[in-house]
């Protein structure tokens, strides 16, 4: 039996050791780390692409210092940008472009770019994290910047008990403390074994260096005064020497405590620039911000199916994301008034399956091929609160008045087939290449204009034309190719080309329109952005990379220069949060690297990482600095 406990009180966030370069060998056994995110189960040293593996010890070290998962990744992965201290990873990217996040190979990204993929699991339940930097054609849409695969802890044959207790405080106030407690039990026999875990985290108030309480984020929603519960179970059945069946199920709920909110001042003074907002423990709202998710993943493995390795997965995920109540302004400057206060809720149902074969038809040739199929359904609503009660309570008493649609509902169906190859010309040179064909079908529902829905709900109109829905599809062929040179047993250098593809957020692109003056209470639609007349253009990215890595006994380094070019870009309209496409080409290039050194005869390591990046947009014949 193994019991591990932790009690940590820190007046400030402290790094106990420098971040490391994930090694190509496991720290405890010396065995190669297999990167399952490659789909071909290659070791790091066999991959012609920048690859990082963050092991459990590094994750635990960072988490024990009080860091969230997204902060851990930003700390340890050179090409990943830093996000705010909130619930979402909004604004985070890899090498300046979008990334895919998966748990045990199940993607958490949706067609709706909701940015809560890293609000998905407690670090206590993570075994290791695999990261592939740059466009990954093998996984298709959305992976133009890179891929993160979170591999969960699994049970062992022997009985094990793991317990973790922790807390941190800045000693600024009685509410300035976070606590966490987690426990897991695993065991079984050589034919069947499993693991069951429960992890709970409570967040208190947050304070700055001068002892002032940090205001709760009412845009992407903050973690102050919230609770997180992650319940996860997994089981493995060894059918015979070659076959196994593995089931993983998770319930995840990260939600505000329902009592703390923002005091907006008398008559919304803080919103109108006539006062200052502050946190309050008197919130009474019919909608609480948070993330709730259920996920099930069933995997079948066969290491000898007609001489091939087979991995087949079937999975399901549903999630509900709610946001903090947000006031909207009406009137004209300088006589603005708060016209409404509301909060959105977005629901996603997602299921799919994938089959991957690995075969070795020749001694020097490895083929990886298979197919993916996924279906996603999305809906969103906006809850409006009683404005008079909210006004009288400084925005703290929020009783439901009515609901409207927030974005048009849609479904997305994706089917893909892929082939990847790796050929050893000789012990020095390995060539790799692959292709993925992906078919995507989007179906969008009819949607009445957002403002017109409000007017109808408030009795100021009787009806309005709907922006018509419809459907469209995309066919994409994505390629990748690379060459790996094994300079020595501990050094490799590589050149890689890979393509990525992404379809901008269709919920924000479609469903908007221009309406005429009402006629007998009915708003006529004059023009609109709809799927039939305006087919959103996908963005294709070509990515190039030149890299080098060294994996020694004490020193481990990895360095890469990268360049990516997209044929178009998109931006966000800050007024209504819709998106619009621009035909301007965008290029991003830079250099990233990391080094880690283990000091002999000690448990200490020192290291550093860096990322120098530049983004440019082409306007006419000139390249200009981008965002």
Q: Where does each model-flagged region fall?
A:
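N-terminal periplasmic "start-of-domain" segments of outer-membrane beta-barrel proteins
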Residues: 31-64
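Extracytoplasmic beta-strand/coil segments of soluble accessory domains associated
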Residues: 36, 70-107, 127
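Short acidic/polar hinge/loop motifs at secondary-structure boundaries
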Residues: 106-133, 183, 233
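A beta-strand signature from Gram-negative outer-membrane beta-barrel systems
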Residues: 121-164
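Gram-negative outer-membrane beta-barrel transporters
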Residues: 164, 424-431, 440, 551-570, ...
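Transmembrane beta-barrel wall of Gram-negative outer-membrane proteins
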Residues: 174-203, 212-260, 292-303, 361, ...
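Face-selective signature of the C-terminal outer-membrane beta-barrel domain
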Residues: 238, 242-252, 287-453, 484-486, ...
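Membrane-embedded beta-barrel scaffold of Gram-negative outer-membrane proteins
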Residues: 299-303, 307-327, 486, 492-498, ...
């Amino acid at each position: 039996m193994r019991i591990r406990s932790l009690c940590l009180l820190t007046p400030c966030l402290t790094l106990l050791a420098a971040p490391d370069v994930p090694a190509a060998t496991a720290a405890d056994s010396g065995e190669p780390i297999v990167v399952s995110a490659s789909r071909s189960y290659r070791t790091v040293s066999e991959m012609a692409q920048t690859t990082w593996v963050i092991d459990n010890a590094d994750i635990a070290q960072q988490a024990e210092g009080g860091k969230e998962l997204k902060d851990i990744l930003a700390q340890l992965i050179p090409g990943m940008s830093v996000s705010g201290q909130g619930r979402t990873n909004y604004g985070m990217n890899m090498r300046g472009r979008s990334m895919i996040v998966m748990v045990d190979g199940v993607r958490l990204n949706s067609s709706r770019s909701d940015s809560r993929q890293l609000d998905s699991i407690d670090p206590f339940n993570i075994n290791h994290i695999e990261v592939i930097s740059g466009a990954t054609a093998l996984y298709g849409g959305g992976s133009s910047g890179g891929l993160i695969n979170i591999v969960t802890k699994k049970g062992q044959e022997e009985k094990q008990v793991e317990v973790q207790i922790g807390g941190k405080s800045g000693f600024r106030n009685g509410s300035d403390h976070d606590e966490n407690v987690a426990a897991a039990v695993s065991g079984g026999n050589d034919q069947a074994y499993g693991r069951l875990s429960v992890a709970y985290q409570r967040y208190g108030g947050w304070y700055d260096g001068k002892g002032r309480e940090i205001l709760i984020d009412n845009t992407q929603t903050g973690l102050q005064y919230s609770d997180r519960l992650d319940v996860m179970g997994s089981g493995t059945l060894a059918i015979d020497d070659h076959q196994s069946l593995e089931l993983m199920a998770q319930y995840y709920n990260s939600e505000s405590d329902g009592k703390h909110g923002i005091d907006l001042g008398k008559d919304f003074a803080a919103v109108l620039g006539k006062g200052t907002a502050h946190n309050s423990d008197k919130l009474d709202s019919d909608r609480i911000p948070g993330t709730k998710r259920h996920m099930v993943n069933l995997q079948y493995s066969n290491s000898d199916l007609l001489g091939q390795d087979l991995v087949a997965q079937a999975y399901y995920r549903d999630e509900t994301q709610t946001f903090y109540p947000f006031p909207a302004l009406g009137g004209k400057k300088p006589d603005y008034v708060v016209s409404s206060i509301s909060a959105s809720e977005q629901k996603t149902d997602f299921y799919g399956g994938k089959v991957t074969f690995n075969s070795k038809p020749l001694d020097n040739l490895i083929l990886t091929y298979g197919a993916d199929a996924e279906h996603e359904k999305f809906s969103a609503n906006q809850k409006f609160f009683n404005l008079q009660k909210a006004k009288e309570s400084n925005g703290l008493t929020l009783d439901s008045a009515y609901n409207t649609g927030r974005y048009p509902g849609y479904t997305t169906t994706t089917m893909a087939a892929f082939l990847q190859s790796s050929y050893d010309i000789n012990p020095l040179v390995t060539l790799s290449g692959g292709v993925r064909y992906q078919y995507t079908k989007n179906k969008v529902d009819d949607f009445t204009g957002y403002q017109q829905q409000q007017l109808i709900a408030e009795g100021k109109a009787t009806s309005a034309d709907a922006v018509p829905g419809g459907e469209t599809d995309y066919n994409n062929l994505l390629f990748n190719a690379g060459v790996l040179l094994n300079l020595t047993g501990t050094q490799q250098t590589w050149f890689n080309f890979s393509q990525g593809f992404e379809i901008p957020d269709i919920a924000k692109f479609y469903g908007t329109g221009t309406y005429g003056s009402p006629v007998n209470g009915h708003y006529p639609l004059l023009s609109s952005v709809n799927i039939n007349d305006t087919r959103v253009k996908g963005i294709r990215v070509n990515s190039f990379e030149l890299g080098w890595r060294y994996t020694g006994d004490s020193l481990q380094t990895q360095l890469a220069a990268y360049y990516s070019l997209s044929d178009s870009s998109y931006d966000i309209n800050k007024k209504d949060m819709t998106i619009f496409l621009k035909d301007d080409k965008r290029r991003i290039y830079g250099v990233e690297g990391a080094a880690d050194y283990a000091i002999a005869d000690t448990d200490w390591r020192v290291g550093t990482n860096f990322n120098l990046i530049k983004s440019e947009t082409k306007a006419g014949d000139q390249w200009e600095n981008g965002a």
